Curated annotation (Swiss-Prot):
Entry protein name: Thioesterase lcsJ
Family: Belongs to the lcsJ thioesterase family.
GO CC term (a single one): membrane
GO MF term list: transferase activity
Gene assigned in the entry: lcsJ
InterPro entries: HotDog_dom_sf (IPR029069), THEM6_lcsJ_thioesterase (IPR051490)
EC nos: 2.3.1.-
Source taxon at top rank: Eukaryota
Keywords from the named record: Glycoprotein, Membrane, Transferase, Transmembrane, Transmembrane helix
Enzyme class: transferase
Induction of expression: Expression is positively regulated by the leucinostatins biosynthesis cluster-specific transcription regulator lcsF.
Location relative to the cell: Membrane
Metabolic or biological pathway, per its Swiss-Prot or TrEMBL entry: Secondary metabolite biosynthesis
C-alpha cells in the first residue's frame, strides 16, 4: 500500500510555523500554562469537584434520630491484618505537576512562593474528599459553648467553611525548570479546634523506595458553621469517618448517643464489627500524628504571643 503523500506546501508551512516566533510562543504557552491567570482557579475547582463527587459516590445511608438523611463513607477493613494506616481518613491525596519557566527565580530554581499554590491544590483535593459526606452541615447538631457559658447542641445557621488557618513549609532541595514532582497531602491528626494536614513535595522518578523529598509542609484547618467553630472530632464523627468516642473515655453524652458511624458499612448500610477499625485504633494513630504537630503548634502560639507582648 502506498503511503499518503503530503503536499509539499503544507509540510513547508508546518515547518515554518514550528521554527518561527509563533512556534516559540506556542511552546512557551504550553509549558507555562499552569502559571496563566485563571488556571489556578480552574485546577482548584476541578480537583475539589472531582474529589468531592467521587467520595459522595462512596457513601451509604446511615440515619440517626437527629439526621434522617445522614450518609457516611464506606470504610471497611480489607482483611483481619489490615492496619490503621489504610483507613480512608488517613489516605493521602496526590497531585502531579512540573516546574514551569514562569516559576523560576533568579537562582534558576522553583521560587519558594510558588510552592504554596501547589499546596493549595493538593490540600483542596484532600479536603474535598473529607468534607463530602456531611457538607454543608445543615442537618448537623453542632456542639458549642453559647455566650451565656452553657453548652449547646443544635442546628446552626450560616455558611459552612473548612478554612486554612496557618501553614509552615520547610525547603529541602531545589527544583530546576521542567522538573516533575508530586505533592502528597494527608491528615495527621486533630485537637479540640484544628485539623492538621501534612504535605510533601517528592520526585518519584527513582521508583518506589527511592523518592526524593524537595519540601515538607504542615497546615491547620478549622471547621466553621456560620460563626460557630465545629470541633474536628464531632465533624469527623458525624461525617462517619470515625466512630463515637466510648463512654469510658468521658466524652459528652451527645456523641455517645450516635448509633451508626459508617465503619464497616457494606453496600446495604449494615455494619460488621470484625470489619471495622475501633475508636482506640484511630485515637492511637491520631496521637502519633500529633507528636509531629505538637512542637509546631506550640511555636505558632508563642510567635503570636511574641507580637502581642
Amino acid at each position: 500500500m502506498d503511503r499518503p503523500q503530503w503536499p509539499g506546501g503544507l509540510i513547508a508551512q508546518v515547518h515554518g510555523f514550528v521554527f518561527s516566533w509563533w512556534g516559540v510562543i506556542l511552546l512557551l504557552a504550553i509549558i507555562n500554562l499552569k502559571s496563566f491567570p485563571g488556571i489556578w482557579t480552574i485546577r482548584a475547582l476541578y480537583h475539589m469537584k472531582s474529589s468531592f463527587n467521587g467520595q459522595l459516590r462512596q457513601t451509604v445511608a446511615s440515619p440517626t434520630a437527629e439526621n434522617a438523611q445522614r450518609r457516611v463513607p464506606k470504610t471497611p477493613k480489607t482483611g483481619a491484618t489490615d492496619t490503621i494506616d489504610h483507613h480512608p481518613l488517613f489516605q493521602p491525596e496526590i497531585i502531579s505537576s512540573h516546574v514551569s519557566p514562569a516559576e523560576i527565580d533568579f537562582n534558576m530554581h522553583k521560587s519558594n512562593s510558588t510552592y504554596f499554590t501547589d499546596l493549595d491544590i493538593s490540600r483542596i483535593k484532600l479536603v474535598g474528599r473529607i468534607m463530602a459526606p456531611a457538607w454543608p452541615l445543615d442537618r448537623m447538631h453542632v456542639e458549642y459553648k453559647g455566650r451565656d457559658g452553657e453548652m449547646k447542641r443544635e442546628r446552626v445557621k450560616g455558611r459552612p467553611a473548612l478554612a486554612l488557618g496557618a501553614t509552615c513549609t520547610s525547603f529541602k532541595r531545589e527544583m530546576k525548570v521542567l522538573a516533575r514532582y508530586d505533592v502528597e497531602s494527608r491528615i495527621l491528626g486533630w485537637d479540640s479546634r484544628w485539623l492538621y494536614i501534612g504535605s510533601w513535595f517528592v520526585s518519584r522518578k527513582g521508583g518506589k523506595g527511592k523518592e526524593q523529598l524537595f519540601a515538607s509542609s504542615l497546615s491547620k484547618y478549622i471547621v466553621k458553621k456560620g460563626r460557630i467553630t465545629v470541633r474536628p472530632e464531632q465533624f469527623l464523627t458525624e461525617s462517619g469517618w470515625i466512630p463515637p468516642r466510648p463512654e469510658s473515655t468521658g466524652n459528652s453524652k451527645s456523641l455517645d448517643s450516635l448509633q451508626a458511624n459508617g465503619h464497616g458499612a457494606t453496600e446495604n448500610g449494615k455494619h460488621d464489627a470484625k470489619d471495622t477499625w475501633t475508636w482506640e485504633e484511630i485515637e492511637s494513630h491520631r496521637l502519633k500524628g500529633m507528636t509531629t504537630v505538637g512542637g509546631w503548634a506550640d511555636a505558632d502560639l508563642r510567635l503570636e504571643q511574641a507580637y502581642s507582648s
